[in-house]
């Protein structure tokens, strides 16, 4: 009898835990900023945001820094970290604007990406870096390669910011949509045939984070194919696996909207 009732008890405990998960943060202020200052076809209006929206951005960061992330349901935790990463990256650029690239905000002329190592992200547990959020909280915490199309590093080659906040209740759908949009977009996957040779040109992200896609995404080619349009899938399948990957140069120019 005990053996039969134990699984039921465990299910009951899990249900109670889910029922008592904290409500996710209010991301409406983030939506308002995106609506006012961001156009995915043009970029972020950093100048206007710095001149008119910085108080709202600062207040949003203060509010998110009070969130007890561990009390949230798992999907809400991942949504929180993705939103916080994008909001914090935006704040880093605003604080150093005008600039031609987020890399130019680094204090080390040799290691031009050390801007991502500064403790610029406010959390309830204290300030951490953008790298901490990306690598420790998001990548290792959730092991989902789709996140690489959701976090934005303020560069032109980076997958665009989503025009809405990420939400735990819709997170899987949103992450799938981000991967699909990017891989079929202007900086996405492009097949080139030269005689019997077929090359698939893709973002450098799939090179930098190869292990994420191989370990958590079933392999780079499997992951890419899943999100391509039916027409591109047919072209890929016609190559019968004889496809070389080539990685595009990464454009670190700021994703700044033309003024």
Protein language model features and the residues they cover:
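Positively charged n-region of N-terminal signal peptides that target proteins for export
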Residues: 1-5
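Bacterial N-terminal signal peptides
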Residues: 7-16
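Sec/Tat signal peptide C-region and signal peptidase I cleavage site
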Residues: 17-21
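Interaction/scaffold regions that mediate signaling and macromolecular assembly across diverse proteins
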Residues: 22-82, 86-259
């Amino acid at each position: 009898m005990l053996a039969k009732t134990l699984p039921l008890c465990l299910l009951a405990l899990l249900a109670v835990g889910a029922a008592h998960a904290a409500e996710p943060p209010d991301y409406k202020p983030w939506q308002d900023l995106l609506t006012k200052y961001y156009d995915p076809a043009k970029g972020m209006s950093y100048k206007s945001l710095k001149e008119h929206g910085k108080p709202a951005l600062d207040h949003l960061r203060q509010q998110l820094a009070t969130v007890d992330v561990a009390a949230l349901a798992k999907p809400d935790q991942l949504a929180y970290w993705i939103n916080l990463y994008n909001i914090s990256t935006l704040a880093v650029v605003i604080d150093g604007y005008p600039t031609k690239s987020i890399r130019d905000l680094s204090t080390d002329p040799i290691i031009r990406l050390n801007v991502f190592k500064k403790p610029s992200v406010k959390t309830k547990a204290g300030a951490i870096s953008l790298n901490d959020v990306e690598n420790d909280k998001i990548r290792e915490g959730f092991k989902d390669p789709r996140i690489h199309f959701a976090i934005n590093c303020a560069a032109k080659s980076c997958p665009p910011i989503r025009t809405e906040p990420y939400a735990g209740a819709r997170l899987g759908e949103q992450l799938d949509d981000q991967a699909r949009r990017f891989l079929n977009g202007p900086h996405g996957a492009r097949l080139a045939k030269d005689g019997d040779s077929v090359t698939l040109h893709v973002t450098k992200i799939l090179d930098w984070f190869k292990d994420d896609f191989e370990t958590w995404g079933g392999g780079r080619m499997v992951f890419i194919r899943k999100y391509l349009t039916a027409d591109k899938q047919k072209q890929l399948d016609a190559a019968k696996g004889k496809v070389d990957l080539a990685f595009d140069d990464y454009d670190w120019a700021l994703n700044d909207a033309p003024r």
